[in-house]
Design a protein with these regions (language model features):
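Conserved AMP-binding/adenylation subdomain of ANL enzymes
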Residues: 3-32, 40-80, 150, 154
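Short aromatic/basic micro-patch
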Residues: 6, 40, 58, 64, ...
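Gly/Ser/Thr-rich phosphate-binding loop
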Residues: 51-55, 79-83, 93-163, 172
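A generic "structured core" feature
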Residues: 1-8, 12-15, 25, 31, ...
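Nucleotide-sugar-dependent glycosyltransferase donor-binding/catalytic pocket residues
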Residues: 24, 39, 63, 118, ...
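Acidic donor-diphosphate engagement hotspot in glycosyltransferases and nucleotidyltransferases
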Residues: 11, 37, 42-43, 69-70, ...
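AMP-dependent adenylate-forming
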Residues: 12, 119, 127-136, 151-235
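Generic structural signal for small/hydrophobic residues in well-ordered secondary structure
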Residues: 9, 35-37, 42, 56, ...
Length: 235
């Protein structure tokens, strides 16, 4: 059941501007809109091109279910930026042939979000010698789509767990124990998020809002979102 996350406009703008700074849409670039509007990542496709010089290409509904049609569209429209959940990315990678690789040469960034990205998927992605970089993005809707970013590379294809990276600009991440104790580097704890990207709370659900959006003990006057996810800082 949808929780009714109340996201502020300025939080959306912050996310979109940081994406543009990190993964710019240049004059001849294009991003593919193929994500259903009920999934928060669709916001980055619908409006992400506002801050760059590229363009938006709208895919027909269900295009992901037709890998060959997707490959043809990437080639025809010279798509440079594209989003996948890891499970769908794995399905797409399984369908790529040597001929298809030629159709994917326009890609610059392949974004993976919404699920854990496996080392198997990373290994397969880089086995195709595509020009694109695979980006691992993490963030609940409560932090306005993305909170952290990690650029994968060919050398990490044997890793068991893929890092989620560091917070994007204007977002802070805390690894805590019992809410008010910061965990040392390398020690697991609950991942909490604060900063400009934080949502206002849940619509008409004050109890859940109070439970998940707590006072930030490390930044007085600010709120902190409890993700419930375990994480640790790498050395």
């Amino acid at each position: 059941k949808p929780k009714g996350v109340m996201v502020e406009h300025h939080s959306v703008i912050n996310t979109l501007m940081q994406l543009e700074k990190k993964y710019p849409l240049e004059k001849n670039d294009s991003i593919l809109l193929k994500t259903n509007y009920t999934f928060d990542v669709s916001v980055t496709e619908l409006f992400g091109w506002f801050f760059g010089e590229g363009k938006l290409i709208i895919a027909k509904s269900g295009l992901e279910k037709e890998p060959e049609a997707l490959f043809n569209m990437i080639q025809e429209k010279k798509i440079t930026h594209i989003n996948f959940v890891p499970s769908m990315l794995q399905v797409i990678l399984n369908e790529i042939t040597q001929t298809d690789i030629e159709k994917l040469q326009s890609l610059k960034y392949v974004f993976s979000a919404g699920e854990a990205l496996s080392g198997k998927t990373i290994k397969q992605f880089y086995s195709y010698t595509l020009p694109a970089v695979l980006e691992n993005l993490y963030g609940p809707t409560e932090s306005t789509i993305y909170a952290t970013q990690y650029t994968t590379n060919e050398e990490m294809k044997g890793l068991l767990n893929t890092p989620i990276g560091k917070p994007i600009r204007n977002v802070q991440a805390f690894i805590v124990k019992d809410i008010d104790q910061l965990q040392p580097i390398g020690v697991a704890g609950e991942l909490c998020i604060s900063g400009v990207g934080l949502a206002r709370g849940y619509l008409n659900r004050p109890d859940l809002t109070a439970e998940k959006f707590v006072d930030n003990p490390f930044v007085p006057g600010e709120k902190m979102y409890r993700t419930g996810d375990l994480a640790r800082w790498l050395p």
